[in-house]
């Protein structure tokens, strides 16, 4: 994934889009997770359902 694709994917995730986990490499997920974290969100992966989605970070 290039930088533009990572940014577009992160934006889609913030908009509530759910992706197939098989579409991303581990490195792609790390880049996306870092970008989401900067926006106060966390990347969640549910391998048993092959889903990738964003959730708001918990405030402690």
Where do the model's predicted regions map?
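C-terminal edge-of-domain segments
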Residues: 46-60
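Compositionally biased amphipathic helical and low-complexity segments enriched in hydrophobic
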Residues: 14-15, 36-37, 44, 52
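An N-terminal amphipathic alpha-helical segment
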Residues: 1-23
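A short, charged, amphipathic alpha-helix used as a generic interaction element across diverse proteins
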Residues: 6, 24-43
């Amino acid at each position: 994934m290039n930088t533009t694709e990572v940014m577009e994917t992160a934006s889609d995730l913030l908009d509530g889009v759910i992706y197939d986990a098989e579409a991303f490499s581990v490195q792609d997920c790390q880049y996306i997770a870092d970008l989401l974290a900067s926006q106060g969100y966390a990347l969640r992966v549910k391998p048993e359902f092959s889903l990738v989605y964003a959730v708001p970070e918990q405030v402690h």
